[in-house]
From Swiss-Prot:
PANTHER family: MITOCHONDRIAL 28S RIBOSOMAL PROTEIN S21, SMALL RIBOSOMAL SUBUNIT PROTEIN BS21M
The species this protein was found in: Acidiphilium cryptum (strain JF-5)
One Pfam short name: Ribosomal_S21
Protein name per its UniProtKB record: Small ribosomal subunit protein bS21
Recorded family membership: Belongs to the bacterial ribosomal protein bS21 family.
Gene3D superfamilies in the cross-refs: Ribosomal protein S8
Gene Ontology MF: a single term: structural constituent of ribosome
GO cellular component terms attached to this protein's record: ribonucleoprotein complex; ribosome
Organism superkingdom: Bacteria
Keywords (A to Z) from UniProt: Ribonucleoprotein, Ribosomal protein
Amino acid sequence: MQVLVRDNNVDQALKALKKKLQREGVFREMKLRRHYEKPSERRAREAAEAVRRARKMERKRIEREGF
């Protein structure tokens, strides 16, 4: 991954790099890989995340349609 540093503004370049890493999901991946996760735990976590996403989408749909 590459970030341009303009006018020796390192703080702005670091901010841009952090935003790119966040968008790519690198921090989340690092957090998940910090410890071994059993396959059964992984399936349970992914199922719970799917349920959470479905509920969130349903809430947004209801809010948008006004039901």
